């Protein structure tokens, strides 16, 4: 008589989730050294097997180009040997970070003599649903392993070959280092049904983190029965105040918009105080033109566009809410700082907003009134990043207020539990 495994009657996604849950239980109590050794093995394996990864990625890139995918999205999909080495370097950076598991968040001895400690513990099984950025595959795996979590990865079908190769390399390295290989799994299948099944795996998957565009995030938030940490889109604003250093403002604007356009911390809207519009806008528009940026302008910006050389088109209502992820920016003139704040409140995705000003009073009011994960004063929006904040690699940038907000590093991939120690204490 053949004995059936309990896994035999399960769908591939459910089977993967059960295996992840088992692996998470094995991973949670491991010491830092064991996890770090596994991560170092992952970094080494990525470098040794770079050609295997790049060859798989080339198939995804060719398919994307044949489908007419924009070059900005193709760039996010592409893995070169240099980019694979950078991913390996990022994994080594995670090794150098403190292990949050077991950290005592707070502790005290109660009046009755009981010792109370709140300590960090892994979340358990983390599901990541993301679009065509294969570097996320390794970043997520590294952060989850370091924080003692198992991870189920569901990337875009456009990067399926790349992700398959990356996960194969990571699993081989993790298993070879003596950790459960099932702590890192690619969700089986390329169909949308596999995504829906992952979203319904409550009780097996402890949290889902979607990374991608507004449509993806909205779908996960609305349809998931698993708790979701929402990583929002990046409709980021740069506001040039009446008291701005205009040279600084041009530099910050161009860096925020054009350094890398296909990322969530790139600026998508420029707001300019009316008192500096006549002096600032011709310079800003010329600089944007030199950077190849098309400006979607309101009528007050249009009035300053003559002889700037800028590619300026009339803004539509949709422009104010658009995360372009391209060489486009919306622009408007506002009557006051408070009007800028009103505009941001109406259209922001809650990611990052910047003010350029020499006025401490204006900076203070802006930072108090704007309710986003990051409010920047005289700095580029591009600094909203786990690496730039010193957190190491990030799992995403949360734009919600519960559990985590802003760049999510290792501590944000943990929860806490209370350890209560007594000496025969009973409650009377």
From Swiss-Prot:
Q: What is its EC number?
A: 1.2.1.41
Carries keyword Amino-acid biosynthesis? yes
Q: Which Gene3D superfamilies match?
A: Aldehyde Dehydrogenase, Chain A, domain 1 (3.40.605.10), Aldehyde Dehydrogenase, Chain A, domain 2 (3.40.309.10)
Which SUPFAM superfamilies has this protein been placed in? ALDH-like
Catalytic reactions of this protein = L-glutamate 5-semialdehyde + phosphate + NADP(+) = L-glutamyl 5-phosphate + NADPH + H(+)
Which GO terms label this protein's molecular function in UniProt? glutamate-5-semialdehyde dehydrogenase activity; NADP binding
Q: Where in the cell is it found?
A: Cytoplasm
Q: Which CDD domains match?
A: ALDH_F18-19_ProA-GPR
* GO aspect biological process, one term: L-proline biosynthetic process
The keyword Amino-acid biosynthesis is assigned to this record:
yes
Q: Which InterPro entries match?
A: Ald_DH/histidinol_DH, Ald_DH_C, Ald_DH_N, Aldehyde_DH_dom, G-glutamylP_reductase_CS, Glu-5-SA_DH, GPR_dom
Q: Name one Pfam family in it.
A: Aldedh
Return the GO cellular component terms, semicolon-separated. cytoplasm
* Superkingdom of source: Bacteria
Which UniProt keywords are listed?
Amino-acid biosynthesis, Cytoplasm, NADP, Oxidoreductase, Proline biosynthesis
Give the protein family.
Belongs to the gamma-glutamyl phosphate reductase family.
Listed HAMAP family: ProA
Protein purpose: Catalyzes the NADPH-dependent reduction of L-glutamate 5-phosphate into L-glutamate 5-semialdehyde and phosphate. The product spontaneously undergoes cyclization to form 1-pyrroline-5-carboxylate.
Q: What name does the UniProt record give this protein? A: Gamma-glutamyl phosphate reductase
Gene name? proA
């Amino acid at each position: 008589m053949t004995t059936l495994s309990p896994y035999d009657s399960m769908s591939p996604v459910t089977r993967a989730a059960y295996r992840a849950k088992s692996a998470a239980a094995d991973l949670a109590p491991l010491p830092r050294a064991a996890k770090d050794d596994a991560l170092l093995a992952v970094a080494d394996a990525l470098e040794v097997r770079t050609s295997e990864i790049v060859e798989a990625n080339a198939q995804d890139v060719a398919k994307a180009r044949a489908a007419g995918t924009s070059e900005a999205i193709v760039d996010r999909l592409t893995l070169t040997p240099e980019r694979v080495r950078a991913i390996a370097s990022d994994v080594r950076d995670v090794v150098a970070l403190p292990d949050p598991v077991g950290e005592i968040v707070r502790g005290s001895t109660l009046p009755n003599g009981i010792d109370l400690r709140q300590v960090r513990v892994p979340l358990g099984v983390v599901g990541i649903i993301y679009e065509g950025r294969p570097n996320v595959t390794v970043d997520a795996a590294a952060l989850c392993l370091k924080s003692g979590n198992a991870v189920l990865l569901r990337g875009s079908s456009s990067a399926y070959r790349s992700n398959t190769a990356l996960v194969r390399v990571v699993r081989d390295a993790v298993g070879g280092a003596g950790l459960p290989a099932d702590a890192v799994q690619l969700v089986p299948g390329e169909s949308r049904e596999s995504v829906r099944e992952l979203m319904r795996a409550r009780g097996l998957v402890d949290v889902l983190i979607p990374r991608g565009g507004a449509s993806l995030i909205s779908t996960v938030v609305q349809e998931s029965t698993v708790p979701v940490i929402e990583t929002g889109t990046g409709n980021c604003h740069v506001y040039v105040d009446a008291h701005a250093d205009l040279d600084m403002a041009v530099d910050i604007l161009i860096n925020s918009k054009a350094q890398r356009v296909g990322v969530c911390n790139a600026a998508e809207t420029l707001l300019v105080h009316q008192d500096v519009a006549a002096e600032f806008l011709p310079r800003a528009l010329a600089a944007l033109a030199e950077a190849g940026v098309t400006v979607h302008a309101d009528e007050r910006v249009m009035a300053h566009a003559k002889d700037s050389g800028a590619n300026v088109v009339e803004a539509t209502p949709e422009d104010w809410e658009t995360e372009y992820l391209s060489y486009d920016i919306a622009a408007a003139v506002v009557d006051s700082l408070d009007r800028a704040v009103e505009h941001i409140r109406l259209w922001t995705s809650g990611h990052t907003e910047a003010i350029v000003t020499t006025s401490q009073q204006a900076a203070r009011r802006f930072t108090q009134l704007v309710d986003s994960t990051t409010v920047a004063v005289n700095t580029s929006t591009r600094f909203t990043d786990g690496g730039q904040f010193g957190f190491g690699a990030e799992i995403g940038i949360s734009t919600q207020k519960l559990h985590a907000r802003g760049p999510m590093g290792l501590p944000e991939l943990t929860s806490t539990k209370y350890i209560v120690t007594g000496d025969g204490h009973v409650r009377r």
